[in-house]
């Protein structure tokens, strides 16, 4: 043995006993074990990302829901026959005459998509739009049609489309809900529009705010406890979850209890993630102006579009935003003009932002 090794062996102060080594490294072993368990828990989570049967063309959805339904013949569905038949009576209705749209349509982009003058900003993205004119409902009434749009049925309780997307693809961010509904209406189907029905409860949407309030004032209620430290909250949650798991063991299997357990854990993780994403103060003035947040007419929906973009970037799988009221039976000119002006600029800004960060091919912005 060389001299250097002899010196090393004789210097007992720099050597650790087996007991000291285990004592000093216990935290490291514990962390390694925790990391392994945590990664396995993430893999086993029902909300973990999953590979679909086919390669998807989009990874997430932003559903822009226009409550009441925009008049298709005045926005994106040009009907030249209405101009030709102006003034003619309808066969099944007396004293009812056909009327063409009072707004001019023009072709835009290389696709030549015809868009009404009511959407001048959105028309600039004509080549990124896909128009589906095949939508219809089984019942000519708003509540049933609204529910059928979201779930596929107005008669039976069915999972919402956001729940199906989350069920099929999982969530990309385990600290955020995979399905978020911003300011949804409480009527016309209510919670069924973002519910999971017979799917496990953790696939239902997380509601933030309601239809009658500005998104700026919306928040997730009871998300945190200002009177309790994070460490103490964790201990309290562990105790509550132990009771929940005992109940689950007795029930053998219950998607509702499993959903409660998962939602409690998610809520604890969301305490820092959600407020940060809903705070637009870190956006520059140019972005806020682009979304119309500096204008009273576009401020509310502009914020929703901006929140949708931020949630999408953070990995939320399905985001629904809502604007209304589009049910213009009377006062069409003023009411439809007002609604289009409130949504045109924010929607165009959302499309522009998604395209700028190469998210257009990954995100499916849907307007209905």
Give the location of each predicted region:
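Ligand-binding pockets and gating/stacking loops
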Residues: 2-362
